[in-house]
A protein has these predicted regions:
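C-terminal motif of bacterial Sec signal peptides marking the signal peptidase cleavage site
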Residues: 17-20
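Bacterial lipoprotein signal-peptidase II cleavage site
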Residues: 22-28
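C-terminal subdomain of the subtilisin-like protease fold in secreted/lumenal serine endopeptidases
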Residues: 25, 341-343, 347-350, 410-414, ...
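Short acidic, glycine-rich surface-loop motifs adjacent to enzyme active sites
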Residues: 41-51, 57, 157-185, 189-192, ...
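Mature extracellular/periplasmic domains of secretome proteins
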Residues: 71-79, 286-288, 309-312, 327-349, ...
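Subtilisin-like serine protease catalytic core
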Residues: 71-85, 92-329, 407-412, 433-437, ...
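Active-site glycine-centered loops adjacent to acidic/histidine catalytic or metal-binding residues
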Residues: 89, 382, 461
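Extracellular S/T/G-rich loop segment that most often corresponds to the catalytic His/Ser-adjacent loop
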Residues: 375, 395, 399-478, 482, ...
Length: 538
């Protein structure tokens, strides 16, 4: 029993809770030489932790984007022109207190009349469009490839090889989480009886003298859990969430017999089968919070004193619901990109991605269309902790569509994630990387933003880093509308800050220049200064 507990504790410590502008000459922009070569030692305050992504690397020794400094010293009272930003995601809470006044409105559509008033092929698309209709749960793409025999034999073999370990992992995880949950629950109930009270603190456990080996094991288990900073009821809730997560994978995401597309009613493998979905671009369930969190990072209302402030102002948010609880369909993404472009979006945020893409050419064609129409596409690099430059670590969509041999000259920008820890651990352990596959890094871990039903909370992922950079792009395009998408991308990359220390990726310590194309971290303050220079020629 003791050996099992030791194995459990080793496992649980990792996974239990894991689930009028001044001229540039008058300003002193941060430079690579300005950044500290030493990591930050002191802990962030609670206030700093909730808004670390807006703090300044020099003044605060945090790898934030200097958003506060940019507004204070550069933007000041300047008002740019409105910029439409499309959020291709899981839908946005259109009634959220920090987002409802920022929604893009289709001028040619009449809400709720059931007609396609502007004849664009989409009925009641007032604030965007819902390409998923009433669907929510969905298979992963490699599961669809196997179950529907998509693509050639080679693709099917690769997908099958990817599926088997995922199934094993999910089945094993369900059993492990159930065993852990049962152990913690029994230990919790036993110690409640021994102490004679429902709730207790870590100090109570430390004072208690165990009367047997079993009690010693119980104390050790509960002490380790509580030493991680949570009370036992919260830990049990997290364990139950883990059980639900992996059970859901087995029931839906990895289930060869599940058909999540049935409620939509279209053929997802026929790009010409149109007219599906509906005009309700909001989230459908409370747990469908991803798109709302992304939208808040990018553009939560800066003129109120409510929950959060977004990176950008003067933004009109276009909601395009295409990302289910599972992998998105290439058809939906391609059509959503074209919709965004045709309806006037100048920036598209894409906080999604997948390893397999049987109809990648549809998305690539849409990205070329966006490039031709001067639209910047900002994509999350992915959360697998992989080197995207290795051929086996594919991530879609990517910039393979580009006709230019120079990545800096296309309209695709890939963003990796930073943690709030300035120092060797500033690259998020989950973030993908690669000199070719990732352009730069931005804040993406422990990010506080909007959640459905006018709530707020912390989430992490490259999904959170992408909208931070998309917000930068929106600000530049708002203040300097004469700049092209390619120029905006180049400004964001060139104005980033180099970090004078090596950072950890797995077991390695590497320079940031080895992990992304620019070798830099995103910074709004320096980006606006450079945009001013490029726009004015000064």
């Amino acid at each position: 029993m003791k050996n099992f507990l030791l194995q459990f504790l080793a496992f649980s410590t990792l996974s239990l809770l894991g689930m009028g502008c001044s001229t540039t000459a008058q300003l002193s922009p941060p430079t690579s030489a300005s950044l500290s070569a030493s990591p930050r030692i002191q802990q962030l305050t609670e206030k700093e932790r909730l808004r670390w992504s807006h703090l300044d690397p020099i003044h605060d020794t945090v790898p934030g984007m200097s958003v506060d400094r940019a507004y204070t010293e550069v933007v000041k009272k300047r008002k740019g022109s409105p910029v439409v930003v499309a959020i291709i995601d899981s839908g946005i809470d259109l009634a959220h207190e920090d987002l409802k006044d920022l929604l893009w409105k289709n001028p040619g559509e009449i809400a709720g009349d059931g007609l396609d008033n502007d004849q664009n092929g989409y009925i009641d698309d007032v604030h965007g469009y819902n390409f998923l209709g009433e669907s929510y749960h969905e298979q992963m793409e490699f599961v669809r490839i196997v179950s529907k025999k998509l693509g050639d034999f080679n693709l099917q073999q690769k997908a099958s090889a990817h599926l088997e370990p995922k199934l094993t992992e999910a089945k094993t995880a369900v059993l492990q989480y159930q065993q852990i949950e049962q152990l913690v629950r029994m230990a919790h109930q036993n110690i409640q009886k021994k102490l004679g009270k429902e709730s207790y603190k870590l100090e109570d456990l430390e004072k208690y003298e165990p009367q047997s080996v079993e009690e010693e094991q119980v104390l050790g288990l509960l002490t380790q859990v509580m030493a991680m900073g949570q009370d036992i009821p919260s830990a049990l809730a997290d364990l139950q969430e883990g059980i639900h997560y992996y059970q859901s994978q087995l029931e839906y995401n990895l289930n060869l017999g599940f058909d999540g597309r049935k409620p939509v009613g279209d053929n997802p493998y026929d790009i010409k089968d149109l007219g599906y979905g509906n005009g309700n671009a909001s989230h459908q369930l409370e747990e469908e919070s991803h798109g709302t969190h992304v939208a808040g990072i990018l553009a939560a209302n800066r003129s109120t004193k409510k929950g959060v402030k977004g990176v950008a102002e003067n933004v009109k948010l276009m909601a395009l619901r295409t990302v289910p609880d599972g992998d998105e369909y290439d058809k939906d993404i391609a059509l959503a990109i074209r919709y965004a472009v045709d309806q006037g979006a100048k920036v598209i945020n894409a906080s999604f991605g997948k390893k397999f893409s049987p109809n990648a050419s549809w998305v690539q064609d849409a990205l070329r269309y966006a490039a031709a129409k001067d639209v910047l596409f900002v994509h999350a690099a992915g959360n697998d902790g992989l080197d995207l430059d290795l051929p086996e670590n594919s991530n879609y969509p990517n910039d393979a569509y580009s006709l230019s041999g120079t990545p800096s000259e296309n309209n695709y920008l890939s963003v990796g994630a930073l943690t709030p820890s300035y120092g060797p651990d500033m690259i998020a352990s989950f973030s993908n990387y690669g000199k070719k596959g990732v352009d730069l890094f931005a804040p993406g871990d422990e990010i506080y933003s909007t959640l459905p039903n006018s709530n707020y909370g912390v989430e992490g992922g490259t999904s959170m880093a992408a909208p931070a950079v998309a917000g930068m792009a929106a600000m530049i395009r708002s203040l300097y509308p004469q700049l092209t998408a390619v120029q905006v991308k180049r400004i964001i990359l060139d104005s980033g800050l180099s970090v004078p220390m090596k950072v950890r990726v797995g077991e390695q310590e590497l320079a940031l220049s080895e992990l992304c194309g620019s070798g830099k971290i995103a910074n709004l303050y320096t980006a606006l200064l450079l945009a001013e220079q490029v726009a004015t020629g000064k």
